[in-house]
Amino acid sequence: TIYKGLLIVAADNPGGGWLAALNRDTGETVWLKKRPAIATYASPIVFDVGGRDQLIIAGCDQVVSYDPNTGEQIWSVDGTTEACVGTVVRYGDLVYATGGYPGQETICIDAGTGKVVWRNDKKSYVPSLLQYDGYLYVVDDSGIAICWNAETGEEQWKQRIGGNFSASPILVGKNIIAIDESGKATVFKADPQGFERVAEQQLGDEAFATPSVSANRLYLRVAQRDGDMRQEVLYCIGRPDAEVIQAE
């Protein structure tokens, strides 16, 4: 994670974990904090929540907030599980974390107070959660899509879309795109009123990377197999006549 002049790196592992901030120009260690000796894989992220910038990371049976400038702990909450992969997401001053091994839990925390708002026994182990317009959308590892009210945790709907997922869902306009490990992309509406499938498309034979969007183009990295040969392929999808937005 890049924050101002810092590159913030997490290395949680059984040999002894740590969280560190490096000077982006020199690589010098600005601060370093020890973390539990547990393997977990979530990336840290900085949000302006609770009236200040907070560096938040999930895993090691906890969700912890640090001051990104100094590494000092702001708050810590017991929750999720040992191993988390998805990055924390936010809605206003609420932050959300989920983990799936060996236990499973999704938790909502008020970042201003460090207090738990709600929690459940559901999980998205590898894919990250997606927040849009006050609702959380989940496409879990086993291919079940869920919509929760972000403030209360109330389930709005649940739908099996099939497949196994490692890539995170992304929002494009008012649609959500999720691609499973076999390369099947499913598009459905980001609508708390109910699940509505918009389209499906097969792209390659394997997919583990999260799609990205830039300049009205959708980019997907997948793999194609031919016998024992495996070749990764990058797809760029968009209308040929669509206006390309130039980066400033």
PLM feature segments, named:
Residues 1-248:
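Noncatalytic, solvent-exposed loop/strand surfaces
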